Amino acid sequence: MGIPMRKPLLVLLVFLALASCCYAAYRPSETLCGGELVDTLQFVCGDRGFYFSRPASRVNRRSRGIVEECCFRSCDLALLETYCATPAKSERDVSTPPTVLPDNFPRYPVGKFFRYDTWKQSAQRLRRGLPALLRARRGRTLAKELEAVREAKRHRPLTARPTRDPAAHGGASPEASGHRK
């Protein structure tokens, strides 16, 4: 009686599967260059942003940039994380309240045509929760009125005509009436 051929073949296949998994886990990390590097950094760092060279406080190797590290050498997740900017505050972090300026804080215009009052009214309207439909309807009405005024100015006659016809009322020019006497 011999050993069935199926059992050693099954053992060999299982061994090859495990070996390939272990090799994939311990093989050197891949290299990233150009757009792939930027896309990967954006994915890893998210809202925090990233640097192409580490800030001075984080330098633990010779000052190489991320391009030299990831494009010419192997690049892994831990290395990518070192190039992320300072972490953004989490939503649960309430240690420092947001800065709120008092209403009497002096405000200075930013530009030549800056109208703080108009902006403030719009912001107050938004805070009150005025529906966008009403704001849009009011804006459309104002736009139609403005267009009507512009149209009226555009079609104004160049010379003004008298509203009454002088010949119809028997009134001729003063010179003509003076000759009748």
Curated annotation (Swiss-Prot):
CDD domains with a match to the protein in the record: IlGF (cd04368)
Compartments reported by the entry: Secreted
Annotated site residue numbers, Important for interaction with integrin: 48, 58, 61-62
Oligomeric form and interacting partners: Interacts with MYORG; this interaction is required for IGF2 secretion. Interacts with integrins ITGAV:ITGB3 and ITGA6:ITGB4; integrin-binding is required for IGF2 signaling. Interacts with IGFBP2.
An example Gene Ontology molecular-function term: integrin binding
Keywords annotated in UniProt: Carbohydrate metabolism, Cleavage on pair of basic residues, Disulfide bond, Glucose metabolism, Glycoprotein, Growth factor, Hormone, Mitogen, Osteogenesis, Secreted, Signal
InterPro entries: IGF2, IGF2_C, Insulin-like, Insulin-like_growth_factor, Insulin-like_sf, Insulin_CS, Insulin_family
Propiece span(s): 92-181
Pfam families (UniProt xref): IGF2_C (PF08365), Insulin (PF00049)
Family stated for the protein in its record: Belongs to the insulin family.
Glycosylation sites: 163
Signal peptide: 1-24
Disulfide cross-links: 33-71, 45-84, 70-75
Renumbered residue ranges of the record's region Disordered: 151-181
Start and end residues of each stretch annotated as D: 86-91
Main location: secreted
Keyword Magnesium: no
Protein's name according to its UniProt entry: Insulin-like growth factor 2
Additional free-text comment from the UniProt record: The IGF2 locus is imprinted. Paternal inherited gene is expressed, while the maternal inherited gene is imprinted, hence silenced.
Region (C): 53-64
Role played: The insulin-like growth factors possess growth-promoting activity. Major fetal growth hormone in mammals. Plays a key role in regulating fetoplacental development. IGF2 is influenced by placental lactogen. Also involved in tissue differentiation. In adults, involved in glucose metabolism in adipose tissue, skeletal muscle and liver. Acts as a ligand for integrin which is required for IGF2 signaling. Positively regulates myogenic transcription factor MYOD1 function by facilitating the recruitment of transcriptional coactivators, thereby controlling muscle terminal differentiation. Preptin undergoes glucose-mediated co-secretion with insulin, and acts as a physiological amplifier of glucose-mediated insulin secretion. Exhibits osteogenic properties by increasing osteoblast mitogenic activity through phosphoactivation of MAPK1 and MAPK3.
The record's account of how the chain is modified after translation: Proteolytically processed by PCSK4, proIGF2 is cleaved at Arg-128 and Arg-92 to generate big-IGF2 and mature IGF2.
A Gene Ontology cellular-component term: extracellular space
Region of interest (A), ranges: 65-85
GO biological process, one term: in utero embryonic development
